[in-house]
Amino acid sequence: MEKFTDLNYTLSVITLMNSTLHTILEDPGMAYFPYIASVLTVLFTLHKASIPTMKIALKTSKCSYKVVKYCIVTILNTLLKLAGYKEQITTKDEIEKQMDRVVKEMRRQLEMIDKLTTREIEQVELLKRIYDKLIVRSTGEIDMTKEINQKNVRTLEEWESGKNPYEPKEVTAAM
């Protein structure tokens, strides 16, 4: 019988809450009620989730200040996101991490520029050497009597032993 009365009591509480919500929602001045309710729900959830988390973190952590600071920053960033802001709150540690990352990236870029500059200088020196070798130099007087390459061409009289080396010869094979 006690379970039945508990169930009856629970149902009456739910009915009372539903009727209260319906009367609030019917009022035209409460157009923002769903937004207010969602913000209150989020705040309540954050409160219920953050208190035990912070208690455990403070007990187990050696540096409680950093934990509290991190929890507060996280809660404020969540509220800012819910409000529609794109900006976030950052701690000095995060700023230092980002600055270290930026400095590391700048060093990497400078090393890359240094390597590329060295390569470009080497390429310019190589091109200068190639250009120096390709420069036309005057060799004095050029023999233009034979314009085409006929220095190795011989006539029948110029051949040794007077025979044409390109004529086919008879070849006999041994059996």
Swiss-Prot record:
Residue intervals annotated with topology Lumenal: 1-28
InterPro entries: Rotavirus_NSP4 (IPR002107)
Keywords assigned: Activation of host autophagy by virus, Calcium, Enterotoxin, Glycoprotein, Host endoplasmic reticulum, Host membrane, Host-virus interaction, Ion channel, Ion transport, Membrane, Metal-binding, Secreted, Signal-anchor, Toxin, Transmembrane, Transmembrane helix, Transport, Viral ion channel, Virulence
Cytoplasmic side stretches: 52-175
Binding residue positions for Ca(2+): E120, Q123
One BP term from GO: symbiont-mediated activation of host autophagy
UniProt main location, coarse: host cell
SUPFAM superfamilies named among the record's database cross-references: Rotavirus nonstructural proteins
Carbohydrate attachment residues: N8, N18
GO cellular component: extracellular region; host caveola; host cell rough endoplasmic reticulum membrane; membrane
The protein's role, per its UniProt record: Plays an essential role in the virus replication cycle by acting as a viroporin. Creates a pore in the host endoplasmic reticulum and as a consequence releases Ca(2+) in the cytoplasm of infected cell. In turn, high levels of cytoplasmic calcium trigger membrane trafficking and transport of viral ER-associated proteins to viroplasms, sites of viral genome replication and immature particle assembly.
Subunit structure: Homotetramer. Interacts with the immature particle in the viroplasm. Interacts with host CAV1, early and late in infection. Interacts with host integrin ITGA1/ITGB1 heterodimer. Interacts with host integrin ITGA2/ITGB1 heterodimer. Interaction with microtubules blocks trafficking to the Golgi apparatus.
Protein's recorded name: Non-structural glycoprotein 4
Lineage, top ranks: Viruses, Riboviria, Orthornavirae, Duplornaviricota, Resentoviricetes
